[in-house]
Swiss-Prot record:
UniProt cross-references to Gene3D superfamilies, sorted A to Z: Ribosomal protein L22/L17 (3.90.470.10)
Pfam families membership: Ribosomal_L22
Higher taxonomy: Bacteria, Pseudomonadati, Pseudomonadota, Betaproteobacteria, Burkholderiales
One Gene Ontology CC term in the entry: cytosolic large ribosomal subunit
Name the record gives this protein: Large ribosomal subunit protein uL22
Amino acid sequence: METTAIIRGVHISAQKTRLVADLIRGKSVAQALNILTFSPKKAAGILKKAVESAIANAEHNDGADIDELKITTIFVDKAQSMKRFSARAKGRGNRIEKQTCHITVKVGA
């Protein structure tokens, strides 16, 4: 049985988050949490929160044993970009796109 946790609209680019997600794909949840705890990247903290949520969902909703769980699926999708304006020289302006992403984590035995 797979249990899912989804975090939507995270303020970090999907490209940066996928780098960390690739490190924990297919690992046991204990090993994945250990990797995320000691990773210096911002995305690691966000993914750790998602993995912990998936573990809690599996324990509460499905009555799963935490020691047997592993990350079966993890993917990061691009979400909406926030368009912002940045003032430049001589009265001009540039558009800045602040990226967001959706994170989906599935855990199972």
